């Protein structure tokens, strides 16, 4: 912290001055010595021999200047790095002090009790919860400062590597042995990358690499995770094939040859994956300059695009190469995408889009390239395309652009795509084939479409896929492109004939998560009372109301696709729960003093949507083909999903964090779920819980409970009087009439009359 970093800039000035002096000496030598052998007064063998020696000396003067300038540049680079890191460390120390911490000269963090008031100090001594919160805070600050100190150490090691390398004469043909370095470079990261490449290449070749060298490779990845020069220099040296072979070797070591150091090898994969992510960044957005557009081609043709173009061309070549055996193949793309899954960095949208296109082209050219033959390769997921889609889900904007049915770019730069159609309807999804002595047994991959489901959820919502325990909020803002994706999903999943919309089991929950975030729109569509949705359903599939984008699909298509999603009870529960929350919020938005008509319209619409849900629920239960669930199990799973976390949800967890809501806003749905939860039996008693679910999912009971909770909070309805009770009964009746309308309409869409 007290080191005088100005010494680095002073030294840099000195080396720059030395380069200038060497330049003067070069000119003098060239004029007064080297020139003698070039004239006509000295001829013959001795002149030729002298000329060769003079040439070497002249080159050494030139190389010495190059080396001196490079050292000066490295010193300035080191100064910039150390000054930045020291500034961050000082800022962290000051932040810790501001948070009532002490930081010693050795970087040890402790709680500064001397700054506390006497009452606070007393509370700290006697309150275990207070003490635990302090311990957590101390650990947090200690971790932050330790990491910053480690960053300084990492940077210092990188500087050491650069200064050791810059003075090495790498040209064996310049006439000297260990002379000045005419190839010296003034960038620390380039030397770190070259050193890392040398270690990585030996590792990829299966050669001996020491523990110290592995630690150095890990440090280089860690220290340069955000440096494009390092990333591109390293990957240019390794090339796609070297990167693939290195991945395979790291997997072999982690899962087979050296299992006790598995964590280290996986961490190295993470560093390599982060390097790929940084090196393949493309300026701008795929929505503006999509693959194949003139704007993208112009960038590729420039200096900045040269690395990317060469890398992608070579990846295309080696991605389709088999690095395994004929009976147990392992294709380059499979290894490369599995490597990408280790990254903690968001991949560029253009890179993901192009790689997705390349993977589709590869499997169209060579069928079954992504199938699994025999035992799974450790650390490798055979279906590289589905694996890439899972990675894409972590960049929702990239996923939206990849699936947008309208394509990307504008004017002459517009490029369409059919990814949604291909992946939902046309692709023959890879299977798992296991050879036996008498036959080959082929089964479906149990993880098939997991990546697709995550990517579609991200694409249609603009958010990361929801995790277990997270609820979709029923009214989220969406872009036009996201609404087009959601509309496109429904269009691709709707049945071409009959009433069945078969949805793969691994797509049901993620698509329900996505659709539930359009509940404000599905509520209107199922309610059947807004002409805007009817008009837009057969047009663009969305419409705008001011700054708000709305999804529009036909009522029939929506009901049939929701029926397909509802084969999974959790998916059905997700949709029903979101709808219940939206109805509750809509009821709360009815102004006090509203007329009966102003109240009955939204309540009738609410009833119609619940009627559609009733028809869908009955359709699933009465389907003899219902796979994997008995009727009782299906209903019980719905129950546990809906009541779980629904009671007084003061903060609804979402993909982006959480949305805080008031207790009163969801009081109706909370009361309903709370009563339901109190009625539930032990989880193993599925038949009993199924009967309870029937009672609470019955629209009469659900809406009566929600309306009662809503009415009790209103000043314009006195539910203790006969008049108030009559008004509540009339409103409940409006809902139930709407329920019959919605149920009858949905049943019509779910009844196959072709037989």
Predicted regions and their residues:
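Non-catalytic all-alpha helical scaffold/repeat segments
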Residues: 172-651, 665-749
């Amino acid at each position: 912290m007290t080191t005088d970093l100005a010494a680095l800039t002073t030294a840099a000035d000195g080396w720059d001055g030395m380069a200038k002096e060497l330049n003067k000496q070069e000119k003098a030598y060239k004029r007064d010595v080297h020139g003698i052998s070039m004239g006509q007064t000295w001829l013959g063998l001795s002149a030729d021999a002298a000329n060769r020696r003079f040439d070497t000396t002249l080159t050494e003067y030139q190389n010495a200047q190059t080396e001196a300038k490079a050292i000066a540049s490295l010193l300035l680079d080191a100064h910039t790095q150390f000054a930045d890191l020291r500034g961050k460390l000082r800022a962290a120390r000051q932040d810790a002090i501001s948070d009532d911490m002490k930081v010693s000269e050795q970087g040890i963090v402790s709680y500064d009790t001397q700054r506390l008031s006497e009452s606070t100090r007393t509370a700290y001594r006697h309150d275990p919860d207070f003490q635990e919160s302090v311990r957590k805070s101390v650990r947090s600050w200690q971790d932050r400062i330790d990491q910053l100190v480690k960053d300084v150490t990492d940077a210092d090691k990188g500087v050491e590597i650069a200064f050791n390398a810059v003075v090495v004469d790498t040209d064996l043909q310049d006439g000297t042995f260990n002379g000045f370095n005419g190839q010296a470079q003034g960038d620390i990261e380039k030397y770190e990358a070259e050193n890392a490449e040398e270690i990585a290449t030996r590792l990829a070749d299966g050669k001996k690499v020491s523990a110290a060298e592995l630690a150095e490779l890990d440090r280089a990845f860690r220290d340069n995770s955000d440096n494009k020069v390092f990333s591109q220099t390293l990957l240019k040296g390794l090339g796609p094939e070297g990167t693939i072979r290195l991945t395979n070797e790291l997997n072999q070591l982690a899962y087979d040859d050296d299992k006790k150091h598995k964590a280290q090898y996986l961490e190295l994969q993470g560093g390599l994956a982060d390097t790929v992510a940084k090196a393949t960044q493309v300026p701008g957005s795929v929505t503006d300059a999509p693959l194949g557009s003139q704007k993208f081609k112009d960038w590729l043709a420039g200096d900045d695009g040269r690395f990317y173009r060469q890398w992608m061309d070579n990846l295309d070549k080696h991605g389709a190469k088999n690095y395994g055996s004929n009976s147990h193949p392992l294709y380059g793309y499979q290894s490369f995408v599995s490597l990408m899954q280790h990254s903690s960095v968001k991949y560029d949208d253009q890179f993901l889009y192009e790689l997705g296109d390349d993977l589709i082209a590869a499997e169209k050219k060579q069928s079954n390239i992504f199938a699994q033959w025999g035992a799974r390769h450790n650390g490798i997921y055979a279906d590289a395309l589905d694996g890439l889609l899972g990675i894409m889900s972590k960049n929702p904007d990239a996923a939206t652009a990849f699936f947008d049915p309208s394509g990307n770019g504008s004017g002459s730069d517009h490029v369409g795509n059919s990814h949604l159609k291909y992946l939902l309807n046309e692709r023959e999804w890879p299977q798992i084939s296991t050879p036996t002595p008498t036959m080959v047994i082929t089964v479906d991959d149990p993880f098939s479409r997991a990546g697709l489901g995550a990517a579609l959820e991200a694409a249609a919502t603009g958010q990361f896929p929801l995790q277990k325990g997270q609820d979709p909020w029923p009214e989220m803002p969406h872009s036009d492109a996201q609404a087009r994706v959601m509309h496109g999903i429904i269009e691709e999943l709707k049945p071409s004939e009959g009433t069945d919309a078969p949805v793969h089991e691994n797509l049901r929950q993620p698509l329900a998560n996505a659709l539930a975030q359009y509940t404000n729109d599905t509520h209107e569509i199922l309610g059947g009372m807004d002409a805007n949705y009817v008009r837009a359903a057969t047009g663009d599939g969305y419409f705008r109301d001011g700054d708000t984008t709305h999804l529009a699909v036909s009522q029939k298509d929506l009901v049939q696709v929701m029926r397909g999603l509802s084969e999974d009870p959790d998916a059905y529960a997700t949709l029903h729960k979101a709808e219940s929350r939206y109805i509750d919020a809509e009821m709360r938005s009815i102004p006090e003093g509203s007329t009966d008509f102003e109240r009955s319209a939204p309540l009738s619409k609410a009833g119609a949507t619940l009627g559609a849900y009733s028809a869908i629920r009955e359709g699933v239960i009465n389907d003899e083909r219902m796979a994997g669930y008995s009727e009782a199990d299906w209903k019980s799973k719905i129950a546990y999903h809906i009541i779980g976390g629904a009671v007084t949800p003061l903060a609804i967890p979402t993909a982006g964090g959480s949305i805080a809501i008031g207790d009163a806003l969801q009081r109706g749905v909370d009361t309903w779920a709370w009563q339901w939860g109190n009625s539930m039996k032990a989880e193993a008693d599925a038949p009993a819980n199924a009967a309870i679910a029937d009672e609470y999912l019955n629209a009469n009971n659900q809406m009566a409970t929600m309306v009662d909770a809503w009415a009790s909070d209103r000043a314009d309805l006195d539910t203790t009087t006969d008049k108030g009770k009559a008004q509540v009964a009339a409103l409940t009746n409006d809902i139930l009439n709407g329920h019959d309308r919605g149920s009858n309409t949905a049943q019509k869409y779910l009844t196959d009359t072709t037989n």
